[in-house]
Every structure is written in structure tokens, then in C-alpha cells.
Amino acid sequence: MAAACECPEPSAPPAGSSAESEVPPAGEEEDEADDESSRSSGSGRESQGPEGGGGAGSLAVSEAEPLSRMDSEDSISSTLMDVDSTVSSGRSTPAMMNGGSANKNLSYSCCWDHCQTPFSCSPDLADHIRSIHVDGQHGGVYVCYWKGCKVYNTPSTSHSWLQRHMLTHSGDKPFKCVVGDCNASFASQGGLARHVPTHFSQQNSSKMANHSKSKEESPSKAGLNRKKKLKIKRKRALARPYDFFDAQTLDAIRHRAICFNLCAQIESLGNGHSVVFHSTVIAKRKEETGKIKLLLHWTPEDILPDVWVNESDRHQQKTKVVHLSKLPKDTALLLDPNIYRNSSKRNTHIGTLKEHLS
């Protein structure tokens, strides 16, 4: 771990001033707790003025991540999403470390190794770090050389991680809240994303409180509303115009049809009402008249009987299309027992009706 940054440009902050900290990766929860406690106590002592003590200024950013975990964009993004700060949060920025808001001529110095370039504002420092020190690294390995950083000289393969990480050193907070008169700004988009819903949750909680008060004041009105809701619920329960034959059901039926064709090894035509049979020659004979006959065998198997045809008719008899109603009933059940299931049930039902009538 490198020594703390001792930049010549920024003045020394009070000992009670809050130090900039970033939520550390997994495995450094104790550092995070220490940073949070020092930040809360420091924000309370800041109002007492510079008499609270002083010391050498240093930028200590608690972000130590091993190479195996820093290389994961998702883990780094989730870690950085916890880094949120507002204008009034008490986190130290280069402006605060150079003497607070009372000094108008603030100086922001780059604490990168072998670089002490001063700047008048934190956005300029952030642009300098991004263009010179971050984008200038090539080769697939990216390292933070900011003096005093807890991940100093720790390699990473994520270029975007290093870009987001350097925002904690520059003090730049480019993500600003646009809700109402809120002046909060954040160093990461994740912090802004978590901050914005807090405005609406406060509004919703106030609305719910007012709504509960109105119910308590007028219980009879609440009872009427409950009855109306029950009536509407009953009406909806009576008729539900939903079509359950959706795309998923159609896919399931199509899948069963494909499985049926594969198991039965058949082809169908006319919306599945006709079966296509294919013939193969299994025997050949020559009659006394000199004509040559061929014995054709039909597939699917055991549905149609083998037949002798003239050799000249072989081309026409390669395939035969037979309607399901024309198939022999004793052998058609070999295709699938469901083919005549409805008709058999219908005949059974008609027979029972006749018995009752007689």
C-alpha cells in the first residue's frame, strides 16, 4: 500500500473534516463502518470551525478489489452503485480538502504518480485524469496510480471500472438530480438511480397517511366504497372474456402433432385429414403373358396390404393419399388410438340412448 498523498497545492483540512470514501468491495466491511462513523462525527464538528485541529491532507479511497473480482464488470458495477453522495452528505471533495467554500481561489491538484498538475475546478481535474491517465493506458490491464488509494497499483482488466473509480479521486459529481428543487449530485449513476425514488416514496407515504386519515374521519364512506368494490368484483367474476387458446397452447398442440408424425412415421395432408403412404418394391415376377408385375409394400407399416401392380404403373404408385375415413378401421388404430376415439364414444352414447328409449 502506497503512502498517503501529499500534494503541494491543496491546504491541509481540519482533522474533523469528512474524508472522501467509497463503499469498499466484499471483504472490507470493517473499513466501511469506520469510514461511516468518522464521516458522521466529522460532519458534526465541521460547524465548529478550524479550531477542531488540523493535519496533513490525504486522499484515502477505500476501494480494494482483487484482480479476480475486479475483472468482473457486474461485481464492480454493484460495488460502485453503493457509492452515492449528495452536496450535503458531508463527503470530502478536492474543494473541501482545499479549505472549504470560504476560499474562492481553490486549487485541485492531480496526485497521480509523477503528476502535480493544478486545476481550478474538479471537472477539469476529472477530464485531465480521464484523458491523460485513464485513456492513456493500453494493453488490457488498467491500474490506479493515485497516491494514497487503497487499490494503488492493483491491476484490473476493466477500463470502465477505472473510469468510474477515478471519479472518487477527482471529486466530480456529474450525475445531478432533476426532481423539483433538489440540488443533490452523485459520483455514480447508481447513486442517482437509488436517490430519485426516494422523492416519490415520500410523496406516496404522505398520500397514504392522508388517505388513512380520511377513512378514519368518515367510516360510512369507506363502507360504501367497500360495497362498490365487491359489486365490481362480482361482475368481473361472472364473465371473463379471456381466450385461453394462446400462442403457448398452439405451440403445445403443434409439438404433439410433430411427435405423433414422428412416432407413427406418417405424412399428412389436408389439415391432417389424409395420410400419405409411400411404396417400395419388395418382389418382381413375370407372368405367362410376358407382363412384369411388381409387389409394392406400403409405409407406414401394417396399414395397407401389399399389392401387385404392372411395371408401367410403378411411377404412379410411388405415393398414395388416403383419407382417414377410408382407412381400414382394424389397422388404422395402429397409427394412433385417438383417430377413432370420438366416433367410438359417439356410437356408444347413441347406443345407450336407444336402450333408454326402448
UniProtKB/Swiss-Prot annotation:
Function statement: DNA-binding transcriptional repressor. May interact with and stimulate the activity of histone methyltransferase complexes.
GO MF entry, a single one: zinc ion binding
Similarity comment text for this entry: Belongs to the AEBP2/jing C2H2-type zinc-finger family.
GO cellular component terms listed in the entry, alphabetical order: ESC/E(Z) complex
UniProt superkingdom: Eukaryota
Start and end residues, zinc fingers (C2H2-type): 108-133, 147-169, 175-199
Bias kind Low complexity: ranges: 1-26, 39-49
One GO-annotated biological process of the protein: regulation of transcription by RNA polymerase II
Name by which UniProt lists this protein: Zinc finger protein aebp2
Ranges annotated as biased composition (Polar residues): 75-92, 199-211
Region of interest (Disordered), residue spans: 1-94, 199-230
Gene this chain is encoded by: aebp2
Compartment(s): Nucleus
InterPro entries on file: AEBP2/jing_C2H2-ZnF, Znf_C2H2_sf, Znf_C2H2_type
PROSITE patterns: ZINC_FINGER_C2H2_1, ZINC_FINGER_C2H2_2
Keyword Transcription regulation: yes
Alphabetized UniProt keyword annotations: Chromatin regulator, DNA-binding, Metal-binding, Nucleus, Repeat, Repressor, Transcription, Transcription regulation, Zinc, Zinc-finger
